């Protein structure tokens, strides 16, 4: 089998055990993306062309298309793709499994610039149901590529800037304890990474995320100062750190002023973890201060597995806040309310509140998610993943597949966040 040929070849790099074999077909970019559970753009497709040395292989991102003019300018010949029979003869791999590994000297392997957006990509491994996840540096080494070329188009337009407005990271000294506790009440969700600063930044960059918001939660009043200090430490153009507050913190209004002075981008509250009601009377002085300081607040909205029998932050309670503090910039996480889309429609759609998309892929049908987005307005929707709990690829792909226009996707993926945070 051709996959065994690749496996034997990759032994020299110690990578033979990293080959993934799928039960489903991965013969096309879309099929490979579904089988691997990644965005189609991260599939590294191998295209075969006639060349001076008998064959030129271009390894490009899944959303890229050959630019005939650029190809001719680079190689001095037209981009004529090989027939399936000729591709098999030259590479030893059938169409659907063509890959850049273990090529003879008369086959030139070139890597296209479209791949460099991603920390890791997935080329085939010789069969129509296989792949391997490699960094671009590994792909260059393992394929013995002759270099990088810029001979593709379309990808710059189809893969927009993405700002993830809902992610979490933890100091290394706390992450193990925190994740152990949270995993026990995660509704069966498994973290996609261990959310340290380094791992989260690496994961985001691997998925071509342009920036992400880090949302901390003070479950006890005593945690506010240290959490906000840590947020200030990691805050950057790439990590858009928010702060947090607890209503029982001594002089919480002064701490909100300090959050603003630290340059943090907003406040995160999680009523279930903090065991507070979002529309408790003592919260309104905090909301008014946030509005005064122009600090957006992200509220976990709807059901949460940490409190499965009592939902503290319902869409109706969020509406009380909207009505009482109209100057507050409020973000209702999880499309306004996990498992409460009927109440979201009743109380929140069309109101002065943003929704983020985190966990929508898990708790909403594609049709219901599109209905909510269109009813509320795409100018008030922010992309969010809830990393480390939500896989980025699945959530990006869901938004691309539900029927939104390119302009709507751009608004959700980055333009709304840029406007909201004045980036």
Predicted regions and their residues:
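Active-site neighborhood of phospho(di)ester-bond hydrolases with catalytic His/Asp-centered motifs
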Residues: 162-165, 213-215, 242-243, 268, ...
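Extended, low-hydrophobicity, polar/charged segments
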Residues: 1-157
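Conserved, mostly hydrophobic/aromatic
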Residues: 166, 204, 231, 259, ...
């Amino acid at each position: 089998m051709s996959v065994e040929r690749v496996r034997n070849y990759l032994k020299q790099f110690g990578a033979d055990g990293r080959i993934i074999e799928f039960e489903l077909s991965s013969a096309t970019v879309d099929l490979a993306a579904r089988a691997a559970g990644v965005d189609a753009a991260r599939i590294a497709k191998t295209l075969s062309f006639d060349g001076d040395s008998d064959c030129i292989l271009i390894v490009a991102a899944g959303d890229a298309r050959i630019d005939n003019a650029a190809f001719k300018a680079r190689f001095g010949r037209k981009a004529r793709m090989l027939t399936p029979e000729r591709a098999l003869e030259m590479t030893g791999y059938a169409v659907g499994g063509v890959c850049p590994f273990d090529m003879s000297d008369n086959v030139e392997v070139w890597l296209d610039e479209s791949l460099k957006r991603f920390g890791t990509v997935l080329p085939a491994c010789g069969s129509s149901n296989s792949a391997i996840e490699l960094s671009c540096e590994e792909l260059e080494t393992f394929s013995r590529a002759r270099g990088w070329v810029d001979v593709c188009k379309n990808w710059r337009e189809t893969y927009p800037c993405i700002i993830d407005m809902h992610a979490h990271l933890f100091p290394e000294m706390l992450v193990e304890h925190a994740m152990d506790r949270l995993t026990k009440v995660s509704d069966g969700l498994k973290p996609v990474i261990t959310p340290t600063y380094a791992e989260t930044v690496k994961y985001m960059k691997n998925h071509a995320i342009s920036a992400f918001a880090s949302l901390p939660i003070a479950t006890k009043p005593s945690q506010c100062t240290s959490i906000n200090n840590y947020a200030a430490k990691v805050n950057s153009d790439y990590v858009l750190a928010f702060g947090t507050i607890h209503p029982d913190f001594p002089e919480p209004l002064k701490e909100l002023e300090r959050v603003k002075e630290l340059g943090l981008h907003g406040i995160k509250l999680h009523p279930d973890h903090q065991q507070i009601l979002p529309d408790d009377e003592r919260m309104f002085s905090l909301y008014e201060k946030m509005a005064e300081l122009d600090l957006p607040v992200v509220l976990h909205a709807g059901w949460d597995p940490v409190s499965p029998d009592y939902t503290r932050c319902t869409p109706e309670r969020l509406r009380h806040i909207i009505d009482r503090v109209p100057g507050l910039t409020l973000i209702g996480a999880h499309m306004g309310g996990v498992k409460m889309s009927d109440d979201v429609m009743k109380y929140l759609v069309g109101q002065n509140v943003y929704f983020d998309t985190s966990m929508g892929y898990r708790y909403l049908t594609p049709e219901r998610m599109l209905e909510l987005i269109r009813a509320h307005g795409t100018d008030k929707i922010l992309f969010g993943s809830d990393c480390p709990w939500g896989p980025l690829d699945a959530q990006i792909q869901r938004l691309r597949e539900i029927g939104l226009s390119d302009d709507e996707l751009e608004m959700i993926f980055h333009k709304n966040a840029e406007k909201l945070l004045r980036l």
